[in-house]
């Protein structure tokens, strides 16, 4: 079931906090930047994972290694424990990033990431997402993303956090 909450996602008591990340090892804006600042371990583990995928791509793909690294990472998730009873989920939903109004979120990757969440998060746990995850910075359509979350995670208590400004 989906619940909407006015408040700061980073103050949630949910078991899991899920946000979208790019495959370039950058957490320089939006929710990702806030998570990076509050829990540096999340960025450290994310950056290390991105570096290892990029090293693999450079070793095995002479042509367009960055593209190969991104395509290998899209749709995956990374779980990083930030408290005894709380884990941040990095959902690799966009290959690159930009600030030009284009859509960087891959709907296929986002959907696959939600499937990965179902595999590694036991039913009965609570999952928090930022309002318009993948939309504000990633350019996706919220109606599509919201429908995906509702369909994929219908067995979970999902909380959508909207930060009042």
Predicted regions and their residues:
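Macrodomain-like recognition of ADP-ribose-binding/processing modules
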Residues: 1-165
């Amino acid at each position: 079931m989906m619940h909407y909450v006015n408040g700061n996602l980073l103050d949630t008591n949910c078991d899991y906090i899920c946000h979208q990340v790019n495959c370039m090892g950058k957490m320089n804006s939006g929710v990702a930047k806030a998570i990076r600042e509050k829990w540096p371990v999340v960025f450290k583990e994310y950056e290390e994972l991105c570096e290892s995928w990029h090293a693999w791509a450079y070793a095995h793909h002479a042509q367009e290694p960055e593209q190969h690294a991104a395509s290998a990472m899209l749709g995956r998730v990374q779980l990083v424990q930030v408290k005894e009873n709380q884990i941040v989920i990095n959902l690799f939903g966009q290959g690159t990033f930009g600030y030009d109004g284009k859509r960087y979120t891959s709907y296929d990757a986002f959907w696959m990431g939600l499937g990965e969440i179902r595999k590694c998060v036991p039913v009965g746990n609570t999952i928090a997402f930022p309002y318009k995850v993948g939309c504000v910075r990633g350019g996706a359509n919220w109606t599509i993303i919201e429908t995906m979350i509702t369909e994929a995670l219908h067995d979970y208590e999902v909380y959508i956090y909207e930060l009042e400004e």
